[in-house]
Amino acid sequence: MMRPVVVKEKQLNESQIHAVEDEVRQAKTMDRDIVTHAMKQSVAKLNPKVMIKNPIMFVVEIGFIITFILSFLPSSSSSIPGWFNITVSLILLFTVLFANFAEALAEGRGKAQADSLKQSKKDVFANVVKENGDIVQVSATDLRKGDVVIVKQGEMIPSDGEVIKGLASVDESAITGESAPVIKEAGGDFCSVTGGTMVVSDEITIVITSNPGESFIDKMISLVEGAARQKTPNEIALNTVLTSLTLIFLIVVVTLPIFTNYLGFQIDTAVLVALLVCLIPTTIGGLLSAIGIAGMDRVTKFNVLAMSGKAVEAAGDINTIILDKTGTITFGNRMAHTLLPVGNETIEQVGKWAAISSVLDETPEGRSVIEYVQGKSISYNRELAEQGEFVPFKAETRMSGVDLQDGTKVRKGAVGSVIEWVQSQGGTIPKDVNQKADFISKEGGTPLVVAVNNRIYGLIYLKDTVKPGMRERFEQLRQMGIKTVMCTGDNPLTAATIAKEAGVDEFVAECKPEDKIAVIKAEQDKGKLVAMTGDGTNDAPALAQADVGLAMNSGTTAAKEAANMIDLDSNPTKIIEVVGIGKQLLMTRGALTTFSIANDIAKYFAIIPAMFTLAIPQMEALNIMKLTSPLSAILSALIFNAVIIPLLIPLAMKGIAYKPMSSNALLSRNLLIYGLGGVIVPFIGIKVIDIIVGLFI
């Protein structure tokens, strides 16, 4: 009996292993394809119309053209051999190619993601319901906003829409990567559906909310391909500074021959070009675009869709995060924790009526009450409740329960609402009701009062558990100087307890959607950048007001349109990771800029003595690296300048190691590693290259 089971299990494991091996092979093939495409693109990007978008590398390309032409002309200097110009031109060519490769590689990863998304955009037909009730099959490309479509089991949802009738399980793995289907139903905050996803059970009727080319997948494809990518304000500012430096050094180099002629010697044009390339910040100039593209790519890999690079950068500068309590800080499933009788009632009586009020209640809270009562072996008449008329919870009444056939009315609900209901029927309120309700609230729980007609029997203690690790995560944010504010509809006592347990800095109790906007504006008035999460239509104004608004993919269309980021996994806690990615992007750009500028110090000590030693022997004192010869020094500096770009591509793509710490500590750390390192590494690198070059010249 056991042997077939063992064989079957072994075969299953082998198939799983083969599946994993296939995935690995496909990933390697994709990586090879991306690299091959990037190599081709690095050559295509040599087009001056493309290169001029990056002024720094455009100057290097002009230098390549000049030295390449000079290599075919007679040398004006007897000290410069004929092969020198062509060697310099080749090094400059590879410098530009390496920079182009970095950008093309970053773009290639986005295009690979776009290709996989395009697979979900197949030729789909939709069953459109006409005004007269007839159902007509049309192509998805012919659908327009406002069309009503029926989607059955096994059919693909043709375009973005909202469910107006029915309930169904929808497979969203084409977008989210999550294989587990999600429930979509009419009404509420989970009615939004996305084109390209598939209905795996039941049937729904949807109203189309986007025209062709405007769907969610269309936007994703456009964004990850980079077609909609615009340079961020910080990127533009840095690019302006780097371009200004390049212009200053260009003026210096162009005017240098005037002074050298005055001193009685001439500098070869190729040497001047080499000096210019070594002076300008080519390292960061070659990696700047790749850093920005890779930053958005990292967000996308986290299953978060950023509508612009500006949103990712803003996440890195966030000062305050507004967080909902339910589902973000806590699990959101309030479960029955204990029963508290009041007056002279017993726990058995409370349990009996609590269970009867919950038999027809399909909410998680109602189910948890039944489970708790059964776990305590408290008896109750289930049939009695099933024969009664269920009274659902309403926002106006804040109660639910059941009206039994004999006229008995059983209710459970918010303390104030049930007390008011009992008093309206002439009942009296036990003295310890409010006392025990306050106790539950102070413990961080939610009190529900159980009453029958005009008599209160006791309270149900519902407890919502704080997610593990939240206190540590908020402490990390605090170390980064980020304030956390919890917004909750709970009463102040419950809110204060949860806030203390979770470790948030501030909380807003009994919070309404409009209160969130007030909190955001108050923080922004202090000059702070604010991030928040949301999924409902009522969250849309606050998401639009926030500097970083992260909407849940499971939420409404209004919320997703108002936000500048969308979490495909619908996990509100991911806002913390998004902030980390934003900070990593800014840190990577800053660190590599520091490294690039620090590099110039070593290049000065390599190339300047080489240029002036023959005319000014005293300049030999600056040759602290003891380089072999002037020509070797110039070539070594140029080679290092070129090689450092591809060596830093992995760092630009992956981002520098990120640890939560204060801004001052972060600045000191980066200056030590990338500032001091940017000075030391070129000294070592240029010297090693000089030794190798010295063997050939």
UniProtKB/Swiss-Prot annotation:
Keywords, comma-separated and alphabetical: ATP-binding, Cell membrane, Ion transport, Magnesium, Membrane, Metal-binding, Nucleotide-binding, Phosphoprotein, Potassium, Potassium transport, Translocase, Transmembrane, Transmembrane helix, Transport
This enzyme's EC code(s): 7.2.2.6
Source taxon at top rank: Bacteria
Binding positions for ATP per the UniProt entry: D361, E365, F393, K394, A395, E396, T397, R398, M399, S400, K412
Presence of the UniProt keyword Magnesium in the record: yes
GO biological process: potassium ion transmembrane transport
InterPro entries (alphabetical): ATPase_P-typ_cyto_dom_N, ATPase_P-typ_P_site, ATPase_P-typ_TM_dom_sf, ATPase_P-typ_transduc_dom_A_sf, HAD-like_sf, HAD_sf, P-type_ATPase_bsu_IA, P_typ_ATPase
Compartments (UniProt record): Cell membrane
Signal peptide range in chain numbering: none
GO CC terms in record: plasma membrane; potassium ion-transporting ATPase complex; potassium:proton antiporter complex
Keyword NAD: no
Residues involved in Mg(2+) binding: D535, D539
Catalytic reaction list: K(+)(out) + ATP + H2O = K(+)(in) + ADP + phosphate + H(+)
Annotated catalytic residues: D324
TM spans (from-to): 55-75, 79-99, 245-265, 271-291, 605-625, 633-653, 677-697
Pfam families from the UniProt entry: E1-E2_ATPase (PF00122), Hydrolase (PF00702)
Function: Part of the high-affinity ATP-driven potassium transport (or Kdp) system, which catalyzes the hydrolysis of ATP coupled with the electrogenic transport of potassium into the cytoplasm. This subunit is responsible for energy coupling to the transport system and for the release of the potassium ions to the cytoplasm.
PANTHER family assigned to the protein according to its UniProt record, in alphabetical order: POTASSIUM-TRANSPORTING ATPASE ATP-BINDING SUBUNIT
Subunit structure: The system is composed of three essential subunits: KdpA, KdpB and KdpC.
Family per similarity comment: Belongs to the cation transport ATPase (P-type) (TC 3.A.3) family. Type IA subfamily.
Record-given protein name: Potassium-transporting ATPase ATP-binding subunit
Organism whose genome encodes this protein: Bacillus cereus (strain ATCC 14579 / DSM 31 / CCUG 7414 / JCM 2152 / NBRC 15305 / NCIMB 9373 / NCTC 2599 / NRRL B-3711)
